[in-house]
């Protein structure tokens, strides 16, 4: 990225929760990728007026403004699909926090729309930019997996806003697919105690070489945000990830990737591989949801 960009893309941030606030901070700070972007305002359902000197603007103004060329969608997952469609139809590039949609068909349709409009549609995956993932990637390369498991625990999450657990937890599924290739669903169960705000989803997957992988999402009051993993290879085992350092500026690293796409610096092959992985994960998440719901 050149230090002095020839032009800046006008950006609006939709949703100013945790992710949206980090995005606004990165856009305002002097980073190489931020030099290509100009934060014009933010959209929120709440009446906030301004945040740190950045003005709130209406959704209608964001869609119709010639100044706005890019939308960062940082709202709850249930609203992503509608926002993406509106901004693509208005001729804007879109960066969206994962999951981009809560169904495979919607994601495919939106990707087709982005291609028709000649716009970038980028789904954030900061989990692939974490130090832990870089460590795992090095550890598993060239090894034959015998079996593996990944358990994620956290506090409760509202399904109405963030989607079925296979969608809200899609970053864990993305880790497994990125490490071991495309996966197929063997079975899935969902245990829920709504009165206790507790849920546990257990998914049995297998690799193309038929090695079993289990993925568990467990959420409830008092559960700390944690990841436990165990991978057994022909050449040894990996039990959990050592402390590999702090994840610095992962949203900024994701923004760098997005700007490279805006500038046409990604090859068609790289873009196609990323799209294939994202759609594979969304398709698996949908399959898991259908499997669990059919057994209720």
Swiss-Prot record:
Entry comment describing in which tissues the protein is expressed: Liver.
An annotated GO cellular component: cytosol
N6-acetyllysine sites (modified residues): 248, 253
Keyword flag Nucleotide-binding: no
UniProt xrefs under InterPro entries: Biliverdin_Rdtase_A, Biliverdin_Rdtase_cat, Gfo/Idh/MocA-like_OxRdtase_N, Gfo/Idh/MocA_Oxidoreductases, NAD(P)-bd_dom_sf
Entry-annotated residues carrying Phosphothreonine: 174
UniProt: NADP(+) binding residues: 16-19, 44-46, 77-80, 98
Enzyme Commission number(s): 1.3.1.24
Propeptide residue interval(s): 1-2
Lineage top rank: taxon: Eukaryota
Keyword Chaperone annotated: no
Bound cofactor: record note: Binds 1 zinc ion per subunit.
Main location class: cytoplasm
Binding-site residues for Zn(2+), renumbered to this chain: 280-281, 292-293
GO MF annotations in UniProt: biliberdin reductase (NAD+) activity; biliverdin reductase (NADP+) activity; biliverdin reductase [NAD(P)+] activity; nucleotide binding; zinc ion binding
Cofactor: Zn(2+)
Record's keyword terms, sorted: Acetylation, Cytoplasm, Metal-binding, NAD, NADP, Oxidoreductase, Phosphoprotein, Zinc
A Gene Ontology BP annotation from the UniProt entry: heme catabolic process
Pathway as given in its UniProt record: Porphyrin-containing compound metabolism; protoheme degradation
Physiological role: Reduces the gamma-methene bridge of the open tetrapyrrole, biliverdin IXalpha, to bilirubin with the concomitant oxidation of a NADH or NADPH cofactor. Does not reduce bilirubin IXbeta. Uses the reactants NADH or NADPH depending on the pH; NADH is used at the acidic pH range (6-6.9) and NADPH at the alkaline range (8.5-8.7). NADPH, however, is the probable reactant in biological systems.
Family membership: Belongs to the Gfo/Idh/MocA family. Biliverdin reductase subfamily.
Clinical condition linked: Hyperbiliverdinemia: A condition characterized by a green discoloration of the skin, urine, serum, and other bodily fluids. It is due to increased biliverdin resulting from inefficient conversion to bilirubin. Affected individuals appear to have symptoms only in the context of obstructive cholestasis and/or liver failure. In some cases, green jaundice can resolve after resolution of obstructive cholestasis.
PANTHER family for the chain: BILIVERDIN REDUCTASE A
Complex and partners: Monomer.
Name of the protein in its database record: Biliverdin reductase A
Species per Swiss-Prot/TrEMBL record: Homo sapiens
